[in-house]
Amino acid sequence: MACMRIYISGPISGQDRIRTVDRFNNTARIIEEAGHRAINPINIAGWGLEWSTYMQIAFDVLQSGEVDMVYMLSGWEESTGASLERYMAIIKGIPVEYQSAEDRKQYKANGGSNGKV
């Protein structure tokens, strides 16, 4: 399998900093151990920016043509930012995969890996 560039999406704003950074970094490590390149938004943007700045950075990355897949961490549906990243991926035709088995089942049943908006 070719090396894919996988953008990690999930709740960040309003979350515990240490747990969130660990969660994203652990996910990135798993992706990289599988031979892919992880695109970790926390490493790109850091911590403590305004929400709108984070979203502009995320949209720029997703529109860059440098993302082959978006990986949605569990709890994404509770996050406006992660939901918008998912929507942007769907619009751009970027495949979306889900950490949660329940999400994978629900969204694949509704039209493939991109699910429904």
Please provide the spans of the model-predicted regions.
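Conserved catalytic or regulatory cores that recognize and/or transform ribose-phosphate-containing ligands
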Residues: 1-117
